[in-house]
Amino acid sequence: LKGNIEDLANHYHALYQEESLADERPENYDEALYWYDEYLESFPEDVETPGIHYQLADLLLENEDFGGAARAYESTAYEYAAHGQAAAAGYAAIYAHREHQKVAVGAQTAMVRSDAVTSTLRFIEAFPTHEHADVVLGAAVDDLYDMDEFELAIENGRKLIADYPRTTPEIRRSAWVVVAHASFDTAAYVDAEDAYMRVLEMTDADDETRQAVVDNLAASIYKQGEQANVMEDYRAAADHFLRIHAVAPGSEIRPAAEYDAGAALMRLEDWTMAAQVLDDFRRTFPDHELNRDATRQIATVYREDGQLARAAAEYE
């Protein structure tokens, strides 16, 4: 009986694939589907059942039932005792999900993407040494960030970096980018700074994205300065703001950071350092919109420091 059912499933599957019988494809598809299902229901524990389940998944994929194929491949990969086709089935499930993404529309799009990510993470856990594990995990990490799943994006981005040291530079850099962005978005600015530094190290000098990386690196440091200001730790705030000069001198936020460093030093009543920082700002960025404010601040610093003549000169 088992052999007869298998023969019938294979027979109708072959007829379905026959180009000369294109007009009969729907009927042959239904027949093949019926007999595959009959086999799975009749012999769920048989040693050959995973292979039959794999063939059913192939049939569904050939008929572009991508969601059904993905589920069938997942069942083949994860619902049986260990077998030789398990890893291939798990990988095929991810492929089917990705094909489904290409044709999904409307609200279905987000669900299909989520299914692809879930399938990928399951695959990585079950088959971490698969030859394409790093590639599919990299795609899932990108998706997790796009889905605003920041903590999972960080966790799996770091997993990719740590567990797959031989992955391509492109995949490694992309993982660090996700870790950096997601850390920034979750206010983990120290981690973001470290990750952006890693990205910068992997970015060529003539890469058109380099300036954005520099700006993001500077922003992660600037945010640490803002946090220190909120905590009224003005010395730490000034130090963070001034670090941008050394770490990201070409960043867009550097002028504002140096001005804010002067303001933090004024709160500390460190008049000498405040005057130096603000004067450096004024000379380095003579056309900046905060230049006039810097002059007023310098005058205030001199006045508070008892240097009235210098204060008066600044007011002039």
Give the ranges of each region predicted by the language model:
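Acidic, polar-rich low-complexity tracts and alpha-helical solenoid repeat scaffolds
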Residues: 1-316
